[in-house]
């Protein structure tokens, strides 16, 4: 499948190759830098609806993230492998991308410190990031924005049907926080699993039915598995002494 089709462009391979942006070994001048974290690889994000040669997207593999806790090796390989592939897809769709591997000599191994030198090197006057799902990173980027002082664009990840503040607004002043209420409001608002104003099936939930066991004749569908060769990533982790737990077949990574 052509890379651009994976990103939703629906164009042929020859056109993809014609407009693929080169790798930026040394960041060229840019007006704006946008940070993409490892769990924000959303090809459908509104950031990517337009190609802007003055915007530089940045992804980075940093010890800050591999070392704050011991992670399973499959998790680290999965993150780095997906990040590298996503960077390739962005370039193939005409976006400028700077990708810092863990072993890049310019890599300070800190997200804020890397952002500082990238901003200085490119001359960018503004930067942006998508809201992290983890409090630790959310606070770090808020602190960096306050200290750095440059105008910052904070965007939603657009991963979910709600924004970060909607749940709090829904339950404001309520004594009980019931998932049932949230679930119903979301279905009414989005039209998902609805026939007009009524729920599909005639009732709002089937909790009682779902507690039953599946029939003995039920055969679960096989999992969707892949076969990625991430031996280069594993060798890099080992060479630089990144401590992980668990084992992995890096030559046939299944996710």
Q: Where do the language-model regions lie?
A:
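Acidic-and-aromatic substrate-binding clefts and catalytic sites of carbohydrate-active enzymes
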Residues: 103-109
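Extreme N-terminal basic, low-complexity initiation segments
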Residues: 2-7
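Residue-identity detector for glycine
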Residues: 8-12
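Beta-rich, aromatic/charged-enriched effector core domains that present basic-aromatic interfaces
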Residues: 110-255
């Amino acid at each position: 499948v052509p890379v651009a089709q994976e990103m939703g462009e629906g164009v042929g391979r020859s056109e993809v190759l014609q407009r693929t942006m080169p790798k930026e070994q040394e960041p060229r001048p840019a007006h704006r830098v946008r940070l993409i974290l490892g769990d924000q690889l959303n090809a459908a994000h509104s950031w990517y609806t337009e190609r802007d040669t003055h915007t530089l997207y940045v992804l980075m593999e940093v010890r800050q993230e591999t070392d704050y806790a011991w992670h399973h090796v499959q998790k680290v390989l999965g993150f780095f492998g997906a990040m590298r592939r996503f960077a390739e897809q962005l370039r193939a769709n005409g976006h400028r991308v700077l990708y810092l591997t863990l072993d890049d000599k310019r890599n300070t191994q800190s997200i804020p410190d890397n952002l500082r030198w990238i901003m200085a090197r490119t001359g960018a006057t503004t930067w942006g990031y998508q809201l992290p799902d983890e409090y630790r990173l959310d606070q770090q980027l808020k602190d960096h924005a306050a200290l750095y002082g440059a105008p910052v664009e904070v965007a939603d990840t657009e991963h979910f049907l709600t924004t970060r503040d909607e749940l709090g607004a829904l339950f404001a002043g309520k004594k009980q926080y019931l998932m049932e209420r949230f679930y119903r409001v979301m279905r009414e608002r989005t039209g998902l699993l609805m026939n007009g104003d009524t729920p599909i099936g005639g009732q709002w939930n089937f909790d009682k039915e779902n507690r039953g066991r599946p029939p003995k004749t039920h055969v679960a569908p096989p999992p969707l598995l892949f076969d990625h060769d991430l031996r280069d990533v594993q060798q890099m982790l080992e060479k630089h002494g990144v401590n992980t737990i668990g084992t992995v077949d890096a030559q046939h990574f299944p996710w």
